[in-house]
From Swiss-Prot:
Lineage: Eukaryota, Sar, Stramenopiles, Ochrophyta, Bacillariophyta
UniProt-listed NCBIfam families: PRK02733.1
Function field: May help in the organization of the PsaE and PsaF subunits.
Key words, A-Z: Chloroplast, Membrane, Photosynthesis, Photosystem I, Plastid, Thylakoid, Transmembrane, Transmembrane helix
Name of protein: Photosystem I reaction center subunit IX
Family the entry assigns: Belongs to the PsaJ family.
Residue ranges of the TM segments: 7-27
Domain of life: Eukaryota
GO biological process, one term: photosynthesis
Subcellular localization: Plastid, Chloroplast thylakoid membrane
């Protein structure tokens, strides 16, 4: 039960850190290559 409570307390923290890193990475890629994410039809 103690391990489960530890998991519940660390998973949101790890998720927040991972999403922050991913968002920052996408923003930096979009800063250097601004047209990379655009779709042209």
């Amino acid at each position: 039960m103690e391990n489960f409570q530890k998991y519940l307390s660390t998973a949101p923290v790890l998720l927040t850190i991972w999403l922050t890193f991913t968002a920052g990475f996408i923003i930096e890629i979009n800063r250097f290559f601004p047209d990379l994410l655009g779709l042209y039809f």
